[in-house]
Amino acid sequence: MSIERDRAHVAAQAGSGAAPVNRKDEHVDLAQGLRGERAAAASGAGAGHPGVWEDVRFVHHSFPGIARDAVDTSTVVCGRDWAVPFHINAMTGGSEKTGRINADLARAAAQTGVAMATGSVSPALRDPELAGTFRVVRENAPEAFLMSNISPEMTVEQAGAAVELIDADALQIHVNPAQELVMPEGDRDFSHWLDRIGEIVEGVDVPVVVKEVGFGVSPRTVAEIAARGVVAVDVSGRGGTNFIDIENRRREKQEYAYLSGWGQTAAECLLDLQVEGAPLVRTSGSPVQMLASGAVSTPLDVIRALALGASAVGVSGHFLNVLLTDGYDALVEELHDWTEQVRTLMTLLGASTVAELQKVDVLVTGSTAEFARLRGVDLAALARRS
C-alpha cells in the first residue's frame, strides 16, 4: 500500500467512525513508505547518487600494522562498557503492533549483545494500559543496556517512572521542536524545556542522554545541555527518518513540504563540535559524550561517525526495515554481520580501538566540507592528523 493510500485509509477510518489508527502505528507505516520513496529516488538518480555520509572518506594505507583478531570493538557509553560501538536506537512503542516490534528488537539485542533504546514511553506514562508495549523490552532483554525515552514535557516524577518501567540503564530525552511544530496535535511552547531537562537530570538516578530526532544539534545546543548536567548528546542528524515529512503527510494540506531538508546531518554536527572552544564540558568539569545517529545504513557509516568523534552510533530505520521486511532471523544476522564488518573496517584503517579510530586521517568533501569551512573547521588538519 502506498503512502497516499495509507493516508487516505487513515482519513477514511476517521471519517467513518471506525477505530482511529494509532499515531505510533501511523508513524511506522509512513516511515517505511518514505524510506521506500527515498530508495527509489536514489536508484533513479543512478549509482553515483550520494548519501549524507558519502562526503566523509578515509586515506588508505597499504600496511594497517595490526591483526584483525587484535581489534577491540568495545566502547564506553554513560560509564558502561558496550561490546560494539553501535546500538538499536529509539523507535516506537505504544500500540499492540509496536509492542510486537519492540519485543523482537529487544530479543535481537539480547541475542547479539547490542544496546537498545525504546521509543518514547510518554504514551505509557499517560495511559498505563500501554505500559506492556514497553515492558516487553526488558522482559526480552534482561541483561542488555537499555535506554528509556521521554519528551521534555514529562515531569521529574514521570521521568523516574520511565526509568522504572523498563529498569533502564540510562534515560534519553528527545528534543523535537521541528516535529512538534509540524505535527497537527504537537506542542507549541518550548520555553520550559531546558529547565525541565535540568530538573530531570537532578531527579533521576541514571545518566541522561539528550537526543534530537533527525535534525541535528549545534554547539550552542550542546552548551545549553552541558549546563544542565546531561551526560551525553545524540546529534541525530538529517537524512534518515524524517519526522517533518512524516508529520506533514498527516496534515490535510501537507503545506510544510518545503521543510524536508531542514537541519544538519550527523557528520556536519560532529564536525561543528570539533571547532576549538566548542562547549563540550559539563558543569561538573567532565566532557559531554557525543553519540551519533541519522541516515546510518552501513557499517562504514558507523566508522565514519566514530572517526569524527562519536563514542557510539545509533541505528533506527535500517534495522527496523530489516525486521519488517525480512524478519527476526534476518535482523539477528544483520547485527552479527555489522559487528564483524566494523571489526574488519577498523583493521583496514589500522585502528585497534575506537580511540585510535578517532586519530586516523579523514577527508571531508562536498557540501559537508562547505558547511564545515563556513563554521570554522580546519579540514586540512583533520586530513593529516595521523
Regions found by a protein language model. Give the residues of each.
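"Short basic amphipathic alpha-helical interaction patches in structured regions
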Residues: 100-107, 130-133, 162-163
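Secondary-structure boundary/capping motif
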Residues: 97-98, 125-129, 217, 323
